[in-house]
């Protein structure tokens, strides 16, 4: 959770009001080749998306993932993301908390087969 405070900071401060917010957070940016947004060099994973549509009445937006970048330091010997190395966190909107990700609780595309019979 090395960058928790820095990520929170750049999310709550407007670049229109604080021009050096990345520098203040200790981040360095690289221009994306896929979307009109910066990539934060210090973060291990970037999921780059383009907006497909947005409904202002419900605040629901749909996006399309156009690129995923992963730092080699968080890959395992098979080239897959090692979640323990990446140490991702998620935002809990119900409680305004950040939570650590990582405990395996099941097998995707497999556990549900028990109900098919």
What are these regions (language model features)?
Residues 1-117:
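Basic, polyanion-binding surface patches
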């Amino acid at each position: 959770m090395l960058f928790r405070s820095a990520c929170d900071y750049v999310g709550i401060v407007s670049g229109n009001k604080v021009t050096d917010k990345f520098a203040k957070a200790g981040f360095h940016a690289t221009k994306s080749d896929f979307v009109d947004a910066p990539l934060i060099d210090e973060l291990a994973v970037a999921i780059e998306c383009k907006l497909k549509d947005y409904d202002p009445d419900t605040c629901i937006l749909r996006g399309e993932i156009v690129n995923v970048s992963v730092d080699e330091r968080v890959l395992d010997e098979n080239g897959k993301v090692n979640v323990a190395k990446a140490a991702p966190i998620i935002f809990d909107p119900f409680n305004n908390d950040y939570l650590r990700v990582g405990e395996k609780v099941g097998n995707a595309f497999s556990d549900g087969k028990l109900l098919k019979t």
